[in-house]
């Protein structure tokens, strides 16, 4: 019986792939796992395992895709996104760049936990001038009222819209489109989890149409200097989380482990605790890049406020949260270790 179900799913996916209606855009669906590919024993329970359903099954569950695009599915990895790695990011980058001329757009199915990070990495590194859309789900594929099928349909619709490429890499979920730089996951369980806290969504999806209302002025994809096509690894950058009563053990551990850069998830306007400050000051003097960010979800970490960044050789992250500041610092360090040049990158991207 299991074999029969598998054959039916593959056949349905093949039918979707074989759609040949005149003028349909060619979309490659790159699957990485996540809740959208999750499976649970109960349709109403909360327990499930991420990354269990293949990309062929995901596509087969939405036969309506054949009406809007020619779909080519590809399984890149099969993981929960809490286990995302730099290696997977580099693999996705390579795959899209290599396949760019073959397709009109790309959809990446992905777990929501680190989706914003993958989106931002690709937003900074892709050389492809085609729409790239990430999508996931907050309920597993076996869940009652699963949001994955509708989200996948909307993501393909978004990738098929040529104007999407002008936005850089985007996330399309819950009928809205948000750009990779500004998006963040805001809720642990609700379907409407993705928001762009500082600047809001860039588009909406309604009645089979994607409408864009705004556009980020930040440079992205082919406009950036961060070409990682020949890299096999990225610089090591860690995050230090500041809180009341924090000690310097974590910061010192990153220094001792010879990390290339450290991002401080500071309080307020990226402020550093007195237990951490001297460690990071010394680290910056010894050539370790230090970026100040904030654990506060909105607002900017501004230069030379309570902390004289120029005096200590620190970089301020602007509106980037700590996890995205880490990514930009990783990429910046592939080009330079000069804190002033790194600051320019944070001001531009």
Positions of PLM-derived features:
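Gram-negative bacterial Sec-dependent N-terminal signal peptides
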Residues: 1-21
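Internal gly/pro-rich beta-alpha loop/helix module
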Residues: 134-206
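C-terminal non-catalytic interaction/assembly regions of soluble proteins
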Residues: 269-349
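A glycine- and small-aliphatic-rich helix-loop capping segment at beta-alpha/alpha-beta transitions
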Residues: 43-52, 120-133, 148-154, 185-191, ...
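Short acidic, glycine-rich surface-loop motifs adjacent to enzyme active sites
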Residues: 100-115, 257-269
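Accessory alpha-helical/coil subdomains and C-terminal extensions
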Residues: 30, 54, 60-62, 179-260, ...
């Amino acid at each position: 019986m299991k074999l029969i179900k598998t054959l039916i799913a593959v056949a349905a996916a093949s039918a979707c792939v074989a759609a040949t209606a005149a003028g349909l855009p060619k979309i490659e669906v790159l699957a990485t796992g996540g809740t959208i590919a999750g499976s649970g024993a109960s349709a109403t329970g909360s327990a499930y395992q991420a990354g269990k359903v293949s990309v062929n099954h995901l596509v087969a569950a939405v036969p309506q895709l054949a009406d809007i695009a020619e779909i080519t599915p590809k399984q890149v990895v099969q993981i929960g996104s809490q286990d995302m790695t730099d290696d997977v990011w580099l693999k996705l980058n390579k795959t899209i760049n290599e396949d760019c001329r073959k397709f009109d757009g790309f959809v990446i199915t992905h777990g929501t936990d680190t989706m914003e990070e993958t989106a931002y990495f690709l937003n900074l590194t892709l050389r492809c001038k085609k729409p790239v859309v990430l999508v996931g789900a907050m309920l597993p594929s076996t869940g009652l009222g699963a949001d994955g099928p509708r989200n996948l349909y909307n993501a393909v619709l978004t990738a098929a819209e040529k104007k999407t490429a002008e936005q850089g890499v985007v996330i399309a979920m819950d009928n809205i489109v948000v750009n990779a730089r500004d998006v963040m996951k805001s809720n642990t369980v609700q379907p409407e989890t993705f928001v762009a806290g500082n600047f809001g969504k860039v588009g909406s999806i309604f009645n089979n149409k994607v409408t864009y209302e705004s556009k980020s002025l930040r440079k992205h994809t082919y406009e950036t200097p961060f070409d990682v096509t020949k890299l096999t690894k990225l610089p090591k950058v860690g995050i230090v989380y500041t809180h009341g009563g924090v000690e310097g053990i974590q910061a010192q551990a990153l220094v001792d482990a010879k990390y290339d850069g450290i991002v401080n998830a500071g309080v307020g306007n990226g402020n550093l605790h007195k237990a951490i400050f001297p460690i990071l000051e010394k680290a910056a003097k010894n050539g370790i890049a230090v970026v100040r960010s904030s654990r506060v979800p909105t607002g900017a970490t501004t230069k030379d406020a309570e902390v004289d960044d120029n005096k200590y050789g620190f970089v301020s992250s602007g509106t980037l949260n700590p996890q995205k500041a880490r990514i930009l610092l990783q990429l910046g360090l592939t080009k330079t270790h000069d804190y002033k040049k790194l600051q320019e990158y944070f001001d531009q991207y």
